[in-house]
């Protein structure tokens, strides 16, 4: 049985979602064959899969099968840093580059030099950082924050996402050119519910692992427990399976895990399907407008305009650039309208001339 596990030291795994991966199911075996074909190359790889499907484990396996196996493997969760810190974390910074930068520090690209950099949750990167990442991938060099000196790097980039980047591109949240740069090779990791042949081998691995930790003797799965595991949909994938097995070992009493020992969640995650063809969105808007018309409010246009802007601003996590792109407006117009509706506070140090200029900007038109 082909089994992948994370390194023993948790400090070596900075983006833990699943701690083990097997390739017993036919779908997993096909993935493994594809993985073994592309791993020796230097091509960028985009790994797509739900949370808990083992994306980091697959990335590590690619690294171990490549010519960079003796170099560093650095895993970075792009969603773990604020927008103000992610640039310094990825590309490094010089002393005094920002408040608190008391010394120069290499970024993750420099740390991974000669090896592999795994960027998990790549879809969470802010657009300005996506531009800089694209340049790094094209030029093979980084410029630290607060510096003008470029530093050559030799890094293979593997990226992963649990969202559909094509939809993010259409929504203006992800750059199309960066997508094609990262997506030289695509590896699709199927959720656990779609590869039932992996469930019992994984369960037995976790039983052995936790039995050793707990000081237990051999533990078996009853036939009914096995059937229950295979029939469950596993919305949390491998990570959920590991937690269920851990709990079952704490409650089973005779060296056999029974069906009643398996505490399965009642959580049902609604997965977004493709919208059917038609005018569903337009119909919803028409119904909403009809209700507003019935109220016969004299300032309806302004209410709708302000509500649209506020909603878009919050949807974009209060990012002006993303909001402007989503609405198809310039940043100046967006900023001026956000100030007008009280979503932004004007900097008191701005001069009178800038205030006059802002007031001349054309109002948002829906």
Swiss-Prot record:
Disruption phenotype: Cells lacking this gene are still able to convert dimethyl sulfide (DMS) to dimethyl sulfone (DMSO2) under sulfate limitation, suggesting that the conversion of dimethyl sulfone (DMSO2) to methanesulfonate (MSA) is interrupted in this mutant.
Gene3D superfamilies in the record: 1.10.8.60, Homeodomain-like, P-loop containing nucleotide triphosphate hydrolases
Residues binding ATP: 49-56, 112-121
Keywords: Activator, ATP-binding, DNA-binding, Nucleotide-binding, Transcription, Transcription regulation
GO terms for MF: ATP binding; ATP hydrolysis activity; DNA binding
Keyword Methyltransferase set for record: no
UniProt domain Sigma-54 factor interaction: residue ranges: 21-250
Induction pattern: Under sulfate limitation conditions, it is transcriptionally activated by the LysR-type transcriptional regulator, CysB.
Physiological role: Involved in the dimethyl sulfide degradation pathway. Activates the expression of sfnG and sfnF.
PANTHER family on file: TRANSCRIPTIONAL REGULATORY PROTEIN, TRANSCRIPTIONAL REGULATORY PROTEIN FLGR
Protein name: Sigma54-dependent transcriptional activator SfnR
Lineage, uppermost ranks: Bacteria, Pseudomonadati, Pseudomonadota, Gammaproteobacteria, Pseudomonadales
